[in-house]
Amino acid sequence: MMGIQILPPQLANQIAAGEVVERPASVVKELVENSLDAGASRVDIEIDKGGSKLIKIRDNGSGIPKDELALALSRHATSKLHTLDDLEAILSFGFRGEALASISSVSRLTLTSRTADQTEAWQAHAEGADMAVKVMPAAHPVGSTIEVVDLFFNTPARRRFLKSDKTEFTHIDEWLKRIALVRGDIHFTLTHNGKMVRNYRPAMNEAQYLQRLTQVCGRPFAEQALKIECQHDDLRLSGYLQSPWSPVISDTHYFYVNGRLIRDRLVNHAVRQAFAQKAELEQPGYVLMLDIDPHQVDVNVHPAKHEVRFHQSRYVHDYILQALQSALEEAGELNFVHSSSLDEVEDVFVDAPTSATEISAPFVLGADSAQVNVPADTLESAQPLVASAVQVKSAGAGREGTSFGTQTNAFGSMATPRDNSRGSYSAGESRQRTELPSKAAIASYGALLQTPSYSVKDQDYQPSLPMPAILDGQYWVMATADKLSLLPIKSVALATRCQEIEAKLATGLIGQPLLMPVSVAADADWQAVLDEHDTLIRQLGLELTIRYQQLIIKKVPPYIRESQLAKVIPEWLQSLRFETPAPSALAFWLAKHSLTGFVSAPEIWAAFSQLAEEKKQLIANKAILLPWQSWLEEQASE
């Protein structure tokens, strides 16, 4: 029997890695969470061969000072907490200080970082049995980049248990979807084997968040989802719940506590209990986010932090259950009209005449009792609905206690309820149903008939201007009042293209990969220029790398794809040495190089017509005034 001894640092870290680093997705999780804790607004994830060859995480967070780089790769070293009180009120993702040390013990890890206070970046990596950390200068913008190369290279047994590259990347992609839902304010990109797979742009408003919800959970879930928003004391529940009338069974089951994704049987039970009397769905889909006082939840109960323990679990369960039940009740009864109003709507439709010729204008009075002219085809289309309304009332009379209603879903359209009665189905029978209109849908149609007819006067509408005559293929002949002028078509094309590009620069241009990358001899300081202006280069849709003193141009925005890239890009990089161009200057640069070939006058005029009046006037001021009056006087005098 061997005596008791202290384990070598590398072996101790490898043992700890057994809990922290299960597979490449675990590495991505730990490193991205560190980026989020550092206040990053953008995180770029680059994966090669499912993560077994390369995992590269780049962020624009606060960075790590040079003096702390060595500590960052040491065990039990963290900036997230310092006392037991901090642990009991933890809100950050990481707090144990084990991730980087554990990952570096089973891979070749390099950490490059720079803070805003530093003039240069520093790079650190650990090697050897004692895991000694070496720090050296490097080029890098504010933020951090972590490269994990050859995961499990020194633990062959662990490497053999990895699945195929496709399977491992699927786990990474699935984890990114989960974090993208709760951190809508972060711009995430995911690249696999050099190809961008995911690009989750920041969702700064509800409409943008719904787009992200559609990207992650799919359109069937997003279109039918019921929005949840409630608060009681220190508890706040928000998110989206699958409609009980959704025809699709969703596998979306995401629950977050203070922004941390967890697996919890408590919330699953609350959801099933809320739906027990509402739908046939055995396990409805949901994206729920619970905000709670951090003192009321213990996040340090699972090695991978997948579970938490609530101090008052029964209270939390009942709160979630009540919130979901309230949302489902509103979905079926309170969204459009109350039950008392539904009876009145039924009476209106039942007592209405059954032929289109008998439906008179008073039947579709507006709110101000003004008559509305309804086209005959609209009246004819209303007749079948009137008959359907009578059928609904008679059918509903025999089903007391059944609630019909509609719920406005996440996209503002109506989620149609379905019959809650359970039926048996044969093996070849479809589960789809032919449903009658609900009472709330009938009420909505009645409100639609009360809408005044469309009038162009009601909108600030301006028809497209007719294109003026073209002179010599270069000018538009502009006639205004008693003035005649020539407007250069190319100057208009340049101005409209600048407006188009500048509007797109706000969210970033999409680069197009070149069939054959362009290679140019690189200057010695170009790598520093690329690192310093990395965000700007990505914003333009450019992908530039330097290898063996050669600048490799892989992606460019469509505006300069046809230009001489071997000349245009190096000239632009030279200008970056002296100043960072403003968005207007970037737009002008791209527009100038995009208009080197043939331009279509009708397309340019159409773009010009869509500009605001003040911008049109600025462009029109470039027109060359023709002295036609003096010319006529000269002709008359002759």
Curated annotation (Swiss-Prot):
InterPro entries recorded: DNA_mismatch_repair_CS (IPR014762), DNA_mismatch_repair_MutL (IPR020667), DNA_mismatch_S5_2-like (IPR013507), HATPase_C_sf (IPR036890), MutL/Mlh/PMS (IPR002099), MutL/Mlh/Pms-like (IPR038973), MutL_C (IPR014790), MutL_C_regsub (IPR042121)
Region forming the signal peptide: none
MF (Gene Ontology): ATP binding; ATP hydrolysis activity; ATP-dependent DNA damage sensor activity; mismatched DNA binding
Pfam families documented for this protein: DNA_mis_repair (PF01119), HATPase_c_3 (PF13589), MutL_C (PF08676)
Region (Disordered): 398-435
Record bears the keyword DNA repair: yes
Gene Ontology cellular component annotations, sorted alphabetically: mismatch repair complex
Coiled-coil region list: none
GO biological process, one term: mismatch repair
Keyword list, A-Z: DNA damage, DNA repair
Superkingdom per UniProt: Bacteria
Entries under SUPFAM superfamilies matching the protein: ATPase domain of HSP90 chaperone/DNA topoisomerase II/histidine kinase, DNA mismatch repair protein MutL, Ribosomal protein S5 domain 2-like
Main function: This protein is involved in the repair of mismatches in DNA. It is required for dam-dependent methyl-directed DNA mismatch repair. May act as a 'molecular matchmaker', a protein that promotes the formation of a stable complex between two or more DNA-binding proteins in an ATP-dependent manner without itself being part of a final effector complex.
Similarity annotation: Belongs to the DNA mismatch repair MutL/HexB family.
Name this polypeptide is given: DNA mismatch repair protein MutL
Name of the encoding gene: mutL
